[in-house]
Each structure stands twice: as C-alpha cells, then as structure tokens.
Amino acid sequence: LIGQIQDSNSFWLSQQITKLGGTMQRISILDDHQPSIVTALRHAIERGAKTVITTGGLGPTPDDLTVPSLAELMGVGTHIDDAVVQDHLRRRGITIDEHTDNLKRMATIPDGATAYPSPAGWAPLVRAVIDGCTFFAMPGPPREMEAVFARFLEDYFSAGEGAHRALTHRVYVDMWESEVAPMLQQVMAAVPGTYCKGYIALGNQRFLPIDVVTRGADEAQAQSELNRALDMLEQLVGEAGRDFQR
C-alpha cells in the first residue's frame, strides 16, 4: 500500500484457482495492521465465503501479523508447532538448541489450526476452519507461495464442491472494441458460462486481442464449450467482413 512491493501473488492464484474450478469473488490488499486484517477476515466469513487465502505475514518480523490475526479471530492463543520445528531441524541440519527465535516465530500457529511444512521455505501453510470458512495462510514470497499451493491446495480446489474446469483461448480480431462488443455479448448468451474480454491496451493498430474463457464439469466439456464459443465468434466476425485469428 506504500508502493514498494508489486502484488503478483493474487494474479497467479486467480489463474490457478480458475483453472482448477474455483471461483474468485474478491481480492483485497491490506496494511500490516492487525485490526484491519481481523476485520477483513471477519467480513469474509459474514459474506459466506467458503475459502479464504492469505499470502504473506508469516515471517519473523514485527509486521508479520497473519497468525496473531487468525488467533484473534478464532479467540484462541498460539503455540509452536512441533512438526514445523522438526522440519526446520532436519532441513537445516541443526539441533533444537540452535533453533532460533526467528524460526520459532515462523513455527507458531493458532491453537486449533493445522500447519503443513513448506517444501520451499521456512514459514508453513497454516489451515484453520472458522464458522464453516476454511482459511489458508500462505507464505508471501512467490516461489514459496507457488510451491505450497502446488503441494497442498491443487487437490483441495480440484475436489471442491461444485468444482469444474476452465479453459482460456486468446484470439485476435480486426475490429474496434466497440464493434466487437455486441458479438461478445451474443457468444456469452449462447454459450452459458462463457466469458469474453477484449484488451484494448494490448492491441496493435489493427488487431484486438480477446480472451474467451469457458467452464465445464471436466476438461472435455470445457473444451467442447470453448470450441462452440470460438466457432460462433469467428462466424460473427466473418459475417461482418473482418479478419479473425485463433
């Protein structure tokens, strides 16, 4: 929020979760301020979110506030997780006497939560269920976050209630955004669950890029719907006497 760090985690997570069948409803960027964090997490529960993912705030410095915020929301204390400590000792080749205060802080989780040692860093994935909402607190560095997601969360979203598959294909049309917009609306109406988006900022002087996203119960159905949407859009553009590139 002070312009020092660019958020790439939410962009990456949105891509992965959509592919695996999840539906993103909201992305928030919060200051390192515990009351603000607790309020945002509580509002997510009140809105009926089934899953909330946080990234960052699991390190050893005073501004790492995710664990104490979760503990406050849960109304519990915290403890040092032995499995995370043992993972630190094994991977670092150290004894318990050499386990530093900073490492202990990164091994600390709310009472009643579950920790999953990270395959790429020292802060674990922390899972907590609060009033029917599952919270996953992930480390902030992108390399660590992506490794934790691949190890622990891909299967969670793939097996989720109402899970589906989503596919995306980018095409290019020889039209202005205002010209092709009615055609995109026709495609989305004809192929339910389809989303079409033109990117005028990415276009050159002639061709406008358009992403077509479709969903299905499985990859085969998503591909079938994608083919339908692409074929229809190509036909509409062709009928207007314009070029269409897949």
Which residues does each predicted region cover?
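Proline/glycine-rich low-complexity loops and linkers
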Residues: 36, 64-161
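An accessory alpha-helical subdomain
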Residues: 133-234
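Conserved short beta-strand edge segments in small beta-sheet-based binding/regulatory domains
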Residues: 233-246
